[in-house]
Amino acid sequence: MQRVTITLDDDLLETLDSLSQRRGYNNRSEAIRDILRSALAQEATQQHGTQGFAVLSYVYEHEKRDLASRIVATQHHHHDLSVATLHVHINHDDCLEIAVLKGDMGDVQHFADDVIAQRGVRHGHLQCLPKED
């Protein structure tokens, strides 16, 4: 492991220290390493051809006209990406779905965009992780 020195302005250092404390890091180095790993993983998952895993979460109104069937059709169209799906009834009108996906990150992003763009889908979020060799 190498020791390096970086220069941060006072506000950024204060933000780093606050983040480190909130997340329970023992020191700034651990926080910086995790921030860097996260940035590298995000960059890697934005490239076509990169294999990886993802979690797509979204809320939708299950009685919105044909929405549930359109979402299912989209899932079946991309069946090769789907590992598992969890369906949760939030209340009388809304459902939360969490889909675990695996495959080419470009295809995963396309699938997520198709689902999130459906009218009636809210709070769509895709979290990607590159496959580690």
Swiss-Prot record:
HAMAP family: NikR (MF_00476)
Keywords assigned: DNA-binding, Metal-binding, Nickel, Repressor, Transcription, Transcription regulation
GO molecular function: DNA-binding transcription factor activity; nickel cation binding; sequence-specific DNA binding
Cofactors: Ni(2+)
Family under the similarity heading: Belongs to the transcriptional regulatory CopG/NikR family.
The name this protein goes by in its record: Nickel-responsive regulator
Bound cofactor: record note: Binds 1 nickel ion per subunit.
Residues bound to Ni(2+): 76, 87, 89, 95
Domain of life: Bacteria
Function text: Transcriptional repressor of the nikABCDE operon. Is active in the presence of excessive concentrations of intracellular nickel.
Quaternary structure (record): Homotetramer.
Segments traversing the membrane: none
GO biological process, one term: response to nickel cation
Lineage of producing organism: Bacteria, Pseudomonadati, Pseudomonadota, Gammaproteobacteria, Enterobacterales
